[in-house]
Amino acid sequence: MQKNLSYKILLLLGILLSYQLYAHDYRNLLQKKASLENVKTSLVSNKQWIKYPNYTDRAGWDKYTSTFKTELIQLGVKQLNYEWKVVKATDYLEYETTGSRVVMEKPFTGNLTALSDLVMAELSEGKGRFIPQIINGVWQTCEMSSWALSAHLVTQKSKRSLPDFNEQLIDLTAGDLGSFLSWTYYFFNKEFDKSNPIISKKLRKNLQDRILDPYMERSDYWWQAFNAQPSTMVNNWNPWCNFNMLTCYLLLEENPIKQAKAVYRTMESVDKFINYNHEDGGCEEGPSYWGHAAGKMYDYLQLLSNATNGKVSIFNEPIIKNMGEYIAKSYVGNGWVVNFADASAKGGGEAGVIFRYGQAVKSTDMQSFAAYLISREKNGDDINAGRDIFRTLENIANHNSLIQTKAALPLNTYAWYPQTQFCYMKTSNGLFFAAKAGYNAESHNHNDVGTFSLYLDAMPLIIDVGVGTYTRQTFSNERYSIWSMQSNYHNLPMINGLPQQFGAEYKAKNVVFDSLKHIFSLDMAGAYSKEVLVDTWNRKYELVSDNGLTITDQFELKDLKDANQINFMTWGKPNLSTDGSVIIEKESKAIVLKYNPTDFIASYDVIPQTDTRLSNVWGKELYRLKLIAKKLVKTGTYTYQIIPKK
């Protein structure tokens, strides 16, 4: 079991073995902005950078929480009788036996939600009635062997999912808890001492032993990326974890030299993330990961700027603005976003983060988009970011400015990301087209070089399915046995009857976008293995209001093995009643896909959705439209036209 688990786990998409299509650009923006000596002289002393009231400043908190005070207190009241859950050893081991991470995460997350609600309620009310339950939550948390998730503990030296008390692992959740509990200590340590001084001492020691010391002593946490090579993937874990480390050191470390060294260490690490990202700002992890990739990078940069009184700030750098504006440009409408890889098709982002990021980089598109999320979809009214107390406090502080901002979606008719190789185009008659080129070893990768999605009046009709509930299989060598990861369940051809392959070498070439002609084209042959026997497969997408979307596949094969099969994933059930024409309709929005009936036989598969992560988005079933070539030919051209149904 142990050997098998070690072999299977390649945590988070081949953390150690993933590669990038383009080598890093060694910008090192943070290190160029400030040296260690600059940081030492720039850090604001005595925590004077903190703009939130002290716990005992009740007038300050009444003003600060304002209209949210009652709401925040009520959330805490619901947790006054909360029974703190024990995460059992068998809950951790479940990840090894069945692959489930939910068994461990459910009680753990329940505890964290209760604790965060109680903390915000006590800050808002200030009468002490939530303190005993906060103490219970803090005490219970400190008694745990680890703050990391079972799915992440397999990166311990033991390679097992049960916490090893000899090793402190800092993952996303351990970092989140470290940051949250650092704020808890900052606000309440004197209140804890009124009950018993051992409480705050125990909490402070846990933070030292679990977070502060390991971060400075170890350089082998994969997300630190200190040893990153030009081809090493650096994903959302980096800014997310480093933000938490920065928070902990700013709040807890009293030695200014040690604090400065830790702050500079986070700068060196976050530079690796910025270096990995392309100048165009595209997020290869997709919109649903943006909040913890570029969005968490923003939190980090803002906190760093606050702590240095603006002396260490890189918000003026074009790449930082580009990374922010990606989230606004990737929004389709009515809650739908462009989703590639593991990203969900539903979302839009956290309005508060998007707004503040937009302010920092002077992007009116981001600020207006954030206002849109609140005014049109109401999702931004929830200012409580759970255990991310920094975001909650910042949401409250900036809410009035946000709701006074004019709401609008970006007006651009296209967006082109030349390095990330994403392309979005819109027409005046309601079509929104999104496609990608890229390579098959991106962060949270699916084998999807050349795929596309098509929306009509913000309704997804030809879709990217996304990903199901994460299990052990998701981040193992079994990943591509999951149907939704495979190219044959994307809007792509099976050439000679075969799908694309996983690996950095499987990539697009000759990728071109013509903004005047509204044409996106690529050669996707390189995304298929040698066994496919394909020389070229040039796909051209052309989007014109009057003619809709025209897709042209021009190909040359070395030899013939099996029929080519062109797949289209659809939300609506395909209507094949007319030869050469397929109607795809969902909720009164319909398109017609036209093909040459002399070239293809059309059919479709029904794909039941039993995974709640997918069924919550798409419902009970999806469909795969299949155009199977009638003739086996070495060279040829296929054309498909998709237009709105009148």
Feature roles, as predicted:
Residues 160-286, 393, 400-406:
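Active-site lining segments of carbohydrate-active enzymes
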Residues 110-122, 169-186, 234-250, 290-302, ...:
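Well-ordered alpha-helical segments within folded domains of soluble proteins
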Residues 76-88, 134-152, 201-226, 261-281, ...:
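Long, well-ordered core segments of solenoidal/helical folds
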Residues 24-96:
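Low-complexity, Ser/Thr/Pro/Gly-enriched N-terminal "stalk/linker" regions
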Residues 47-49, 99-111, 123, 158-174, ...:
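Solvent-exposed loop and edge beta-strand segments that line ligand/cofactor-binding
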Residues 294-461, 513-514, 632:
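Carbohydrate-active enzyme catalytic cores, enriched for enzymes
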